[in-house]
């Protein structure tokens, strides 16, 4: 007997899960700092909106499907950590106090939390080294293979450089890994410390915070709301409703 209700049931269950995840996300405390994971983004005004926890435009919150993608990324990170340990890497995800490796700067208003530190392991690597992992789609995975990290994903590269600088792990290349979520292929790259990139990102954070302290609204990235960065920004309407 054919089941003509499968689509309706899938939609119903999916909606229930979406709403539950969105409610849970709404209860999370807002960040009161600039995160290292976002300091490589193009638009400084967007980072100001993030820092102030400015309400997003109507309908621009993260839907349940996107929240599940984020959750998948955390699970994939745990799996990759287990696989690296299985391969002989002494990977530490927590420090001696049981806390995630991280740093704070500018009176706690700039922070970052690294995936881990590898302190020993197979030959051919220099220890200790920072470890950072991402779960990515096929297109991003291909771009990483073709262009490498700095050219294909500058936001990730900035994050790595900041962790190397502030965690004192700049002497040895970091190990950046990415897992293709579609076929679980692994990409790995040694990332040399980019001192200039880390310094520019730190200076940028200070400039953004100074502007926030003086109520200065930093310039938009573009002169038109149809710019690609603006189209995907959750504060697009708010930003472009302002006089400048």
What spans do the regions from the language model cover?
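Metal-dependent nuclease catalytic regions and adjoining charged, substrate-binding loops involved
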Residues: 4-5, 143-157, 162-244
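Residues immediately flanking
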Residues: 133-135, 235
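Metal-dependent nuclease catalytic cores that hydrolyze phosphodiester bonds in DNA/RNA
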Residues: 1-130, 137-139, 150
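Generic beta-sheet signal
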Residues: 94, 133, 177-179
């Amino acid at each position: 007997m054919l089941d003509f209700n499968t689509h309706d049931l899938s939609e119903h269950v999916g909606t229930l899960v979406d709403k539950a995840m969105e409610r849970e996300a709404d209860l999370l405390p807002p960040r009161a700092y600039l995160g290292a994971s976002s300091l490589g983004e193009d638009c400084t005004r967007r980072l100001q909106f993030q820092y102030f926890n400015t309400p997003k435009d109507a309908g621009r919150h993260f839907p349940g499907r996107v929240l599940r993608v984020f959750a998948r990324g955390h699970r994939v990170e745990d799996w990759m950590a287990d696989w690296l340990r299985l391969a002989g890497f002494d990977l530490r995800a927590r420090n001696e106090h049981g806390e995630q490796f991280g740093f704070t700067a500018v009176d706690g208003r700039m922070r970052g939390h690294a995936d881990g530190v590898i302190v020993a392991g197979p030959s051919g690597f220099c220890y200790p080294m920072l470890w950072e992992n991402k779960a990515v789609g096929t297109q991003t995975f291909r771009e990483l293979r073709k262009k490498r990290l700095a050219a294909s994903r500058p936001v990730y590269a900035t994050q790595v450089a900041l962790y190397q600088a502030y965690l004192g792990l700049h002497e040895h290349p970091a190990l950046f890994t990415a897992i293709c979520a579609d076929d679980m292929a692994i990409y790995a790259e040694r990332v040399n410390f980019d001192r200039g990139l880390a310094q520019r990102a730190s200076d940028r954070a200070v400039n953004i915070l100074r502007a926030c302290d003086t109520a200065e609204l930093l310039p938009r990235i573009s002169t038109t709301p149809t710019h690609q960065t603006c189209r995907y920004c959750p504060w697009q309407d708010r930003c472009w409703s302002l006089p400048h």
